[in-house]
């Protein structure tokens, strides 16, 4: 998968065919239905389920109303431009409930925990963990062997296309419920304390915290021991 810059993402979304995917449970004289090519069906006897775009399914249901006794419809998107990613493409641990859009790069042995949200164009390096409920906005970049804490937000930048994305270098640890604003660069080996609001670049091998975040100290042996990442959690 190729890396996308802002203009590529804008072009992708702008030109994509917008879809409203639906799943419909149907009951009736299903053998009498004339199903168009754009709808996939799984029928058995007088009951079954079908999948398709609402633009195709709605007229189909109306045209076949006489042969449909009842139906129940499920729908979780409207005019969506970006599908969900095919998770099978990644050599990573991705837990149930993670929301990952198409066109996201995820390195080997990365870990994406429950409830994490990863938007289009984001990049996650090898061995990095995105903890529960963390949000990576569009084009956010996370290097190798990082830990992005639960509830943390790495702000996304798709528009304007000239804006710089958030960049987190290798070996960075960010505590829970922190926020890193657009264009901020967090240097290699840095630690961002829980709850920090990071509005400016962070130097490598430093600890920052507070609102707004300020340098607290340089990384020392005590800090390293408290922020050690465990390779066993990244085993597949």
Curated annotation (Swiss-Prot):
It catalyses: (S)-2,3,4,5-tetrahydrodipicolinate + acetyl-CoA + H2O = L-2-acetamido-6-oxoheptanedioate + CoA. GO terms for biological process: diaminopimelate biosynthetic process; lysine biosynthetic process via diaminopimelate. Its EC number is 2.3.1.89. InterPro entries: DapH (IPR019873), DapH_N (IPR013710), Hexapep (IPR001451), Hexapep_transf_CS (IPR018357), Trans_hexapeptide_repeat (IPR050179), Trimer_LpxA-like_sf (IPR011004). Pathway: Amino-acid biosynthesis; L-lysine biosynthesis via DAP pathway; LL-2,6-diaminopimelate from (S)-tetrahydrodipicolinate (acetylase route): step 1/3. Pfam families: DapH_N, Hexapep, Hexapep_2. It comes from the Bacteria. One of its GO terms (molecular function) is tetrahydrodipicolinate N-acetyltransferase activity. Keywords: Acyltransferase, Amino-acid biosynthesis, Diaminopimelate biosynthesis, Lysine biosynthesis, Repeat, Transferase. The keyword DNA-binding does not apply. Catalyzes the transfer of an acetyl group from acetyl-CoA to tetrahydrodipicolinate. Belongs to the transferase hexapeptide repeat family. DapH subfamily. This is 2,3,4,5-tetrahydropyridine-2,6-dicarboxylate N-acetyltransferase. It comes from Lactiplantibacillus plantarum (strain ATCC BAA-793 / NCIMB 8826 / WCFS1). The gene is dapH.
């Amino acid at each position: 998968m190729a890396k996308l810059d802002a203009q590529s993402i804008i072009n992708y979304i702008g030109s994509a065919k917008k879809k409203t995917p639906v799943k419909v449970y149907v009951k009736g004289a299903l053998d009498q239905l004339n199903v168009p090519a754009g709808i996939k069906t799984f029928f058995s006897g007088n009951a079954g389920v079908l999948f398709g775009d609402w633009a195709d399914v709605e007229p189909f249901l109306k045209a076949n109303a006489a042969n449909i006794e009842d139906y129940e419809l499920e729908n979780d998107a409207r005019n969506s431009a970006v599908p969900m990613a095919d998770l099978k493409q990644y050599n990573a641990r991705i837990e149930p409930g993670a929301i990952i859009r198409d066109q996201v790069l995820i390195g080997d042995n990365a870990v994406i925990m429950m409830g994490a949200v990863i938007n289009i164009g984001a990049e996650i390096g090898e061995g990095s963990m995105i903890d529960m409920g963390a949000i990576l906005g569009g084009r956010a970049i996370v290097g190798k062997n990082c830990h992005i804490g639960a509830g943390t937000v790495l702000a996304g930048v798709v528009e304007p296309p000239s804006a710089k994305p958030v960049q987190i270098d290798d070996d960075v640890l960010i505590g829970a419920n922190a926020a890193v604003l657009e264009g901020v660069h967090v240097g290699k080996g840095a630690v961002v304390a829980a709850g920090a609001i990071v509005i400016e670049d962070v130097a490598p091998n430093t600890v920052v915290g507070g609102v707004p975040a300020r340098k607290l100290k340089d990384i020392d042996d005590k800090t390293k021991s408290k922020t050690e990442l465990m390779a066993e959690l990244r085993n597949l």
